UniProtKB/Swiss-Prot annotation:
Disulphide bridges: none
Enzyme class label: hydrolase
Signal peptide (UniProt feature, chain positions): none
GO cellular component: membrane
Residues at the catalytic site: H28, H96
Family: Belongs to the lipase/esterase LIP3/BchO family.
InterPro entries reported in the protein's UniProt record: AB_hydrolase_1, AB_hydrolase_fold, AB_hydrolase_sf, Hydrolase_4
The UniProt record lists the keyword Lipid metabolism: no
Enzyme Commission number(s) from the entry: 3.1.-.-
UniProt GO molecular function: carboxylic ester hydrolase activity
Name the UniProt record assigns to this protein: Putative esterase/lipase 2
């Protein structure tokens, strides 16, 4: 049985080489877990890049029934506490979907400790505004290209549709968290909007999938570009909401180019 309280740091997955230039923290999405980045972790280890990852309350091996813990603001507080406790600096936050929203909100709180943001299909005010026709087309046109939109990146490859149906029927915690996310993503909600406004000139890489129907690609680019002129956008063709999972090498290469670009600009 899940406990009412949880400790997201009880099972941290970390790689800490002796010499490190950056401290990466991976922030997973709704209903996912840090293992969604497992292919990327292998590439980081080969490069000897330091990173940390953990599961938010209600996810993976960190189950919780506490309504107070299943909120976006609580997740933000947890990440901020982790950075402060570990005395981390030069932090690069890598956030997917909900984790992307958490990343921008953490940056707004601990701006001096955050070196850069890597946002993967980040939740924003264009999220959850999905065309019903596009969903149906994706469900009933079973081509490899659009099928990926509805494949969850867990090991058993469950359909994301079945995942949501099962979660909503059996698990009150996901209902609570999903409602909180939708509320935070609505137009007119100052909390998440303030986070995106706080990006300003912070080096930021946004990676999107061309077939994403959860975080609409074109609308997200237009929305995010209004908040910062320095954001670098990369769109990976043929993938949906999890470009880091379906194209890990390309995703990793984009991060490398992004960091090299930051260094060049600093050396000027």
């Amino acid at each position: 049985m899940a406990s009412s309280k949880s400790d997201p740091f009880q099972s941290i997955f970390a790689f800490k080489p002796h010499r490190k230039r950056h401290n990466f923290i991976f922030l997973h999405g709704f209903g996912s877990e840090y293992s969604s980045f497992k292919h990327v972790f292998k590439l980081f280890e080969k490069k000897r890049w330091s990173f940390f990852a953990f599961n938010f309350p209600g996810h993976g091996n960190n189950q919780s029934n506490s309504v107070d813990e299943l909120k976006l603001k609580h997740y933000v507080e947890l990440v901020c506490d982790f950075i402060i406790q570990k005395r981390l600096k030069k932090v690069v936050l890598v956030g997917h979907s909900m984790g992307g929203a958490i990343a921008v909100l953490v940056n707004a709180v601990l701006r001096e400790r955050i070196k850069a943001l890597v946002l993967v299909a980040p939740m924003n005010q264009t999220s959850f505004v999905v065309s019903k026709k596009r969903i149906l087309d994706t469900l009933f046109t079973r081509s490899p290209k659009n099928q990926q939109d509805f494949i969850e990146h867990t090991d058993d490859k469950k359909s994301i549709v079945n995942f949501f149906v099962g979660a909503f029927k059996k698990r009150v915690n996901f209902k609570t968290l999903y409602s909180d996310m939708v509320q935070n993503a609505k137009y007119g909600n100052d909390y998440l909007e303030a986070g995106y406004n706080a990006i300003k000139d912070k080096p930021t890489l946004v990676v999107l999938g061309s077939n994403d129907i959860v975080t609409p690609t074109k609308a997200s680019v237009e929305y995010l570009a209004k908040h910062s002129e320095t954001i670098i956008f990369k769109i990976i063709d043929g993938v949906g909401h999890s470009p880091h999972y379906y194209a890990p090498k390309l995703f990793f290469d984009y991060i490398g180019e992004f960091l090299d670009n930051i260094k060049r600009n600093k050396d000027k």
